[in-house]
Amino acid sequence: MYPSSNAMPRRSGWTLAGAAFALSLSASTAFAGCSGTGALAIGGPGGVTPFLPFASGGAISSLIAAINTSNTAFLTQSTAFVSAPANPAPGQEGGGVWARAIGGEITTKNTTTTSNVQALGVPVPGTITCDNENKLSFAGAQVGTDIASLNVSGWNFHVGSTVGYLAAKSRDVSSVGPLNPLGGTFTDELQVPFVGLYAAATKDGFFIDGQIRRDFYQNSLNDPLVSGLFNQKLDARGLAFSGNIGYNIPLQNNWFIEPSAGVVVSKVKVDPLNVSGSGLAAFLAGGFGTFPGQLRISDINSTLARLSVRGGTTIASGSMIWQPFVTLSVYHEFQGAITSSFDGVAVTNFTGVGGLPSGLVSTSNIGTYGQIGLGVSGQIAGTGLLGYLRGDYREGENLRGYSLNGGIRYQFTPDLVAPRPMYAKAPILKAPAAFVQAYNWTGFFIGGSLGVLNGQLDMDYLAPPIAAGLTANPRFAGALGGFQAGYDYQTGKWVFGVEANINATNARGAKPCQVFILVTCEDKKDWIGTATARAGYAFWNRSIVYGRAGAAFTNTTITATCNGNGVIPIGCPATDSQSRVGWTVGFGSEFALSPNWTVRGETNYYDLGKNQYNLQQIAPAPTFVVDVREKGFISTVGLNYRFTPGVVVAKY
């Protein structure tokens, strides 16, 4: 390992049900692989191209395709799955909980151009152009909760939080070409947990919404024969804003048409990727080994705009209300090519060996594509239960694919709902007063939560002397789910309580270790728990906002992994695991859906202080002593069952 010291979206969610018609769709044909010009046109032993780890473009284009698809999979479905009762009283409280799932496959095409190549410090004339094709399969789920103020001068206002998780696998399926005789060889398996806040407003047929979201990309890259990647970990982080606006126009005989527009603006930052090169593995396979180096991908920016028209009808059948629909959309990506660079500077700084290949890489973006969606939404009349199911097909010059997604929502409904879709706006006229009960929060509760865990380790090397003073800061993120139990006591508007919870998680993270260019510092945890007190205030009849503080505890494992699959360098792996205890503080809100059931969303910050880890390498390599500080966030959406709910007073 190391050298030794000796060396519906939107307001209601029915747009979540349709999407897109393909305008000017191109035929789907396989791309033709890689070719070069000038000195870079020469493959085999007489040329420099076989020694450039990213010249084929497959690794970069696959990574960009994976991040781009993950970045837009849920965002383009609109903001969140929100709705309101059809006939709310003026100023009525509202709230609900929802969940949706999505799965599908997308194939993207792009052109990668490698230029400005140098080898042994000498410019190499020419370029390498690769027509890359990547196939990405994905599946994910998202949950959210919101509270609302309904019929405020005819407006409905919703504010909520959401968490989710997307798993995907990207495969380079590019065709064989003169400079890539093996065709596509790169794969990327990734998980993308995310957290977000959303808001929506509706009035009559008008709706507008927005969401801000934080994404955490945990990649596992594999391309042993071309790039020298052996399931190597790579982290990236994204911030995205999405917005939608539209108008629902009622037609005769329960038909409707709904034009809308939306935009997703996002930025993803990718950590540097140090690669060991395919060297030994490629030579053993009879090929030509690539050199080690570092890949730096610039920020991946996206500005994806959408224009849609949705049409359908409403059908009442017994206790069900159905709304079949079709949606036609066109999407356009306004951002241009993504730029990257690779060189051997980091290797040279550590080993003193210079002249390693370097170059610039430009990868085209997805452009314009169309989408058609078919679906149906439904509501059980007289209840707060509603849902939808939809399928989408999309195609464009550089993209084609399909997805299937569906969702369900339950919301607080104080009176019987009129026989019309729950995708309702506030009425123009004053509604009759609804029978609303003020909630009593006193009593025991148990429940479950789903969410996201993310954070960072700050590593300070103490020994051996060769490493003292060096640092590394790997981040981590993953899905989280578990159980909580506690007790609340209400006095007046104030609510005080205690709670303990325990959650399983698949949180992982990685970043290049500073002690050696070809080593990655990885961290993981399998569970985390908290024990806290909380204090809240019931601003309204059925909802509270609260703060909480107490203890956090977990077990964190740190592993130093050799990028060269254990061949180079020696000493790998080095691992240590520590149980840790620290403090946590957070805030959240909770809403009473029924006399016994409540839903909540909350975020907690935790800090576990410093612990000392001893990363013992395989002898004769030395043990590395590292001070590690851990801090992070726990964001969840939870559902609680309360054993002793009560009605304080009935209000009319």
What are these regions (language model features)?
Residues 2-209, 216-218, 229-542, 554-555, ...:
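Secretion/assembly modules of Gram-negative surface proteins
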Residues 222:
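Substrate-binding cleft of carbohydrate-active enzyme catalytic domains
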Residues 563-567:
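Glycine-aromatic-enriched beta-strand/loop faces of beta-sandwich-type recognition domains
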